[in-house]
Structures are given as C-alpha cells and as structure tokens.
Amino acid sequence: MVGVSNWAAPSTATPVHATVTVPGSKSQTNRALVLAALAAREGSSRISGALRSRDTDLMIGALETLGLSVAASDSDPADLTVSGTLAPAAEARVDCGLAGTVLRFVPPIAALSAQTVTFDGDEQARSRPIAPLLDGLRTLGVDIDGDGLPFAVRGTGTVAGGTVEIDASGSSQFVSGLLLSGAAFTDGLTIVHTGDSVPSAPHIAMTVSMLRDAGVEVDDSAPDRWRVSPGPIGARDWVIEPDLSNSVPFLAAAVVSGGAVRITGWPTVSIQPADTILKILAGLNGEVRKGSSYLEVQGATNYGGIDVDLRDVGELAPSVAAMAALADPGSVSRLRGIAHLRGHETDRLAALSTEINGIGGQCEETEDGLVITAREMHGGTWSSYADHRMATAGAIIGLRVPGIEVEDIGTTAKTLPDFPQLWADMLGGQTDDLQQGPSARETPGR
C-alpha cells in the first residue's frame, strides 16, 4: 500500500502489568449521534465522553451533510452538542468511509429529508452488505437508486412506515438502522426478521435500550420481531461508556503474558456485552477482578484452548483468535457462529487464517468459524486488510512473537485513536503490584 509503512509490534518476555483507559464506545456514540439528530426538532442534545475516531467523525460529517450541527466543546472534543434541522443541501453526498454504522444508520434519516442524498465510501465498503436495508426502505415507500455503494436516497420529507420483512442474518445493523428512525415514520415501524439467527444481538439490545432512554416505545417481546411506535424522539444528555470491545486487546495482553491489566472506568452495569467478554477471558484461564470503577484481568502462567460461540460478539473474534494462537502448544480452539464476519471490513475468517498460517501457526476455516491449533510461530508481516481489529490482533501476537510487523497500524484510528501510543504506554508503564492494592481486592470473582 502506497504511503503505509509497517509497525514493529513490541514484544515482551515478561508479564505485562499496567492500567489502561480506553475511549468511549463507538457503537454507543454513533447511536447517540443518530438519536440526537432525530431529536433535534425537540431541542439540543449533549453527548459526554463521545469517541472521536474515524468512524464517529464520519457519522458527525454525515449528520452535518444532512443539515444538523454537531459542535464540540472548546475544552473537550468528546463533549458534543447536536442541534439544528434536517435540511441537506441539493446534491448532498455522504461519505460512509468504511463505517458500517454510517452506511446503515444514515439512509433512513436521509429518507426523512426533502432532498436526494447520495451515499458512497471507501472501495472496501462497496463490498459490504447493504441490500436488505435498502430493500426494506423500498418496502416502506422510499425511492432509492442503486443496490450498493454508491446509491441515492430520494427523500420526500416523510416516510409512511408500516411493516417490513428483512433478512438480517448478515448484520444486526440492518435492524438497528431501521429501528433508530422508526419512531419518526408516520405509522411507526414493525420489523420482522425472516432469515437465520441475527448475529451481534447485543447491539440490537443496545439500540432498543437507547431508544427507550429517548422516550420511544419499543416492543421486542416476540423473537425476531420489533415494533416501534410513532412519536417524538426526546432530546437529552447522553453519557458514553468506555468501549469494552476495544479494551479486549489490552486485557488480552494480560492473558498471553501472565500479567495483570486493569481497565479504568469499567461500568458496573453496561449496555455492552460485558458479561460475555468476561466469560471469554475466564475461559482462557484469566482471573477477573471487578471493582466499583475498574476491571482487572490476571493472566495465568499457561492456558489451553477455548471452544466458544462468538455470534453475539463477532467483533472480538480477531482478539480471541490471537489469544488462541498463543495458547499452550497443541491446544485446540474452536471459534463458532461467526460466518457473518466474511462480510465485515474484510473477510475476517480468511484474513485470520491467512495471517496466522503465514507466521507458522495453524488456523483452518470452517463453515461458521475457525479451528486454531496453537503452534510455535515466527516473525513476519501481519497484514491488516484496512481492518482495525485485524491490526490489533497482530499487536497481541507480537507481544509474544518477536519480529511481527503490522501493516497499516493506522487503520486502528477507525475506532481506537492513538492505539500505537496506548499500546506503548501499556508496556512502558509497568505496575507490578496491581493485584496487591486494596481496591483490586474489593470484589474478587470469576
């Protein structure tokens, strides 16, 4: 890739001991931005602790293209105020980049405008699934030109709403994208999922929870069916949690090195899949300690393979695959329920298999996942495929395999700005007695 140099992943032969603070949740930030935009007719909304990354800045840019104002505080760029009116200029164009949330959450908003809005993005984004969402909007009476990027939404100022059947087995974002705008449709919205099980279901639960927080009535009592009643979306203050999925590479450093890493600001109760993350880490012999405002993982001196269904948390698959590849030699791990990752930023299953095998590991694709047999690996180039989670997986492996060079580490800016510096700080700020402190013993548990 022109202009992109490889990043020498730092290695350590000793346990990692560190305290890390990760920025806000991308998923929660972009949902809050969308809900604040839809609530602008009711008043201004404030978002505190917002993630500022490529994906969230693309969302901000998209909403500004649609006529909204998203203003950052002079003192804190993570403190945002959303106001204004949905009034895109003629021939407005939204850049989706490689952000699935922009690609799938913003077209329904554009349909509520009175202009034609064109959507495009990075070259890799053109292969990401979008047809189920566009077909769903067409069922609701929206005029759309195209079946993939670039496409144009011809807004008329209103969307009638009603019932739509879609196959969301390729991405939960098809459901979330429609749900977020559904209350603004004249008759509200009923979504019926018709395909295989929906992946990343906790993300739909996050959408429903945030809609309810904004005063929207949502009925999700029946499996694979969601009903959003028509009505105002309330302007309010949103407080964004730390991004727990982005904490996993740092917690993985504790697992693979036998050290202890503490994440500050870990929520006591979360709308993210916190419990699933902790179960995975415990399954890799990590000891989990929770306090009132942190989470700490203590790695063991050794750990074996794991058999885990990642359907609900597919975004964790690259990190889990990296930990599996570094397990005790001969250990076998099975990562299941992640066939949908073939349609993410890249085909993550093929990418993980290629990269792990390329440095001497053993990784085989299955119909819905990966089988990884831990073997001694060697240094080499780890390609990121412009995928932030592939890049962080390479960093995890590099901790224990000297000579790993990650191609295009800058792609981590998609959701985790300054990742290389955060990673270096983690390794540079060793704290050997984390587990001995009084706060670390507040609420021990697994």
From Swiss-Prot:
Q: Would you name any one GO CC term?
A: cytoplasm
Q: Tell me the InterPro entries matching this sequence.
A: Enolpyruvate_Tfrase_dom, Enolpyruvate_Tfrase_sf, EPSP_synthase, EPSP_synthase_CS, RNA3'P_cycl/enolpyr_Trfase_a/b
- Tell me which CDD domains the record gives: EPSP_synthase
List the active site: E315
**Binding-site list for 3-phosphoshikimate:** K26, S27, R31, S171, S172, Q173, S200, E315, H344
The answer, when asked if Amino-acid biosynthesis is one of the entry's keywords, is yes
Principal EC category? transferase
Answer yes or no on keyword Acetylation: no
Its subcellular locations are: Cytoplasm
Q: Keyword annotations for this protein?
A: Amino-acid biosynthesis, Aromatic amino acid biosynthesis, Cytoplasm, Transferase
Assigned EC number: 2.5.1.19
Instruction: Give the matching PANTHER family.
Output: AROM/DEHYDROQUINATE SYNTHASE, PENTAFUNCTIONAL AROM POLYPEPTIDE
Which family does the similarity line name?
Answer: Belongs to the EPSP synthase family.
Q: Which HAMAP family match?
A: EPSP_synth (MF_00210)
Q: What does this protein do?
A: Catalyzes the transfer of the enolpyruvyl moiety of phosphoenolpyruvate (PEP) to the 5-hydroxyl of shikimate-3-phosphate (S3P) to produce enolpyruvyl shikimate-3-phosphate and inorganic phosphate.
Q: What is this protein called?
A: 3-phosphoshikimate 1-carboxyvinyltransferase
- Species annotation: Mycolicibacterium gilvum (strain PYR-GCK) (Mycobacterium gilvum (strain PYR-GCK))
